[in-house]
Amino acid sequence: MMKLEMICTGEEVLSGQIVDTNAAWFASTMMEHGIEIQRRVTVGDRLEDLIAVFQERSLHADVILVNGGLGPTSDDMSAEAMAKAKGESLVENREWRQHLEDWFTRNNREMPVSNLKQAMLPESAVMVDNPVGTACGFRVKLNRAWLFFTPGVPFELKHMVKEQFIPFIREEFDLDAKVALKKLLTIGHGESSLADKIEPLELPEGITIGYRSSMPHIEIKIFARGEKAIALLPRVTGHIKMVLGTAVVAEDKATLAEEIHTKLLNSGLTLSVAESCTGGMITSQLVDFPGSSSYLQHGLVTYSNESKVRVLGVNPATLDDHGAVSIPTVEEMAKGARAILDSDFALATSGIAGPDGGTEEKPVGTVAIALATRSGVYSQMIKLPRRSRDLVRSLSAAVAYDMLRRELLTEAVIVDYQSIGRFSK
């Protein structure tokens, strides 16, 4: 079995000044290809530390992806450290120098002398093309390992991993490419409760389960390795969906917003949104996807009671009698939002995101959500975990999306989630 490791470089990563999203993305991407990372090391911008970690980890791994330290500044030391670790000199790669000169010419810029550093590679290095940036990738064999050097810029890293790194390791180590993956998106359940339901199942050989928490969702990944396991994947996926029931809200989608976008795109149906506690989050997540203008008619943030009355037509008496966070108010918000442009659907939210503003009757985390359709209105009052303001807003948006998703599938719109409480009208 090939042993894959990752070395992340940079003082800002080591000190926690930036979150290392590159490492998370790389590990997740490798897992989707059926390849697990055995170890990840983070090291700062000190030459002696880089040399030591290259020499030490190359004794144990078969492949090491090194990320960062390929820029033109004095603290970019990956190439120099690799050369010293192998007892080599740095030499200019003429092909990459030409690439740099052409890149700056195309962008109507004069190339700084410091950028020439990016064409200096260890003598034994094999250049790895980076068509989307100025940092030259390369690979070097040291001890038992191939060290594969990539830039820290996320877009450049992702391009090189997909186009260069994965094909290289598959060919070099004759890896079986027969890997399939299904993803199930869930809300309302924690990892432990999902695992309690899934782990008693007897999985066929070659099929494994993984979990990824990205609140408000938890993603279940079902891996199948080998032809027999791949053939059984649909049956296993169906069984898991049956066991989890309403917890599963999407399949092979990263978020519920993506699921809603996919279902509404080119459907001819239209959506309007009126948001109070979610503050535009529902609308914003849909606008992230190209083509959302084909169905999204408007998104209104009606935060104050006055805006609910004047923009959406909520009856002042409703607010006086029931309050802003109530079923009657949110239903009138949804009806008003739908009526403005005669949309097919309208979502509305009103809640207490915290950390202040809660009462004994309506504590922080209390949210009213409504879905207005041409045939009527669905609504519910839910109680969400109080861990953070952002979590309350994110979960509120997710539940609103799920109500719309269920209506589009002609399923029951109001369902129970384990970790989401519900109040009566």
UniProtKB/Swiss-Prot annotation:
The family database entries (Gene3D superfamilies) matched by this protein are listed as: CinA-like (3.90.950.20), MoaB/Mog-like domain (3.40.980.10)
* Record field: transmembrane: none
Q: State the family named in the UniProt similarity comment for this chain.
A: Belongs to the CinA family.
Q: Which PANTHER family match?
A: NICOTINAMIDE-NUCLEOTIDE AMIDOHYDROLASE PNCC, NMN AMIDOHYDROLASE-LIKE PROTEIN YFAY
Q: What is this protein called?
A: CinA-like protein
Q: What is the lineage of its organism?
A: Bacteria, Pseudomonadati, Pseudomonadota, Gammaproteobacteria, Alteromonadales
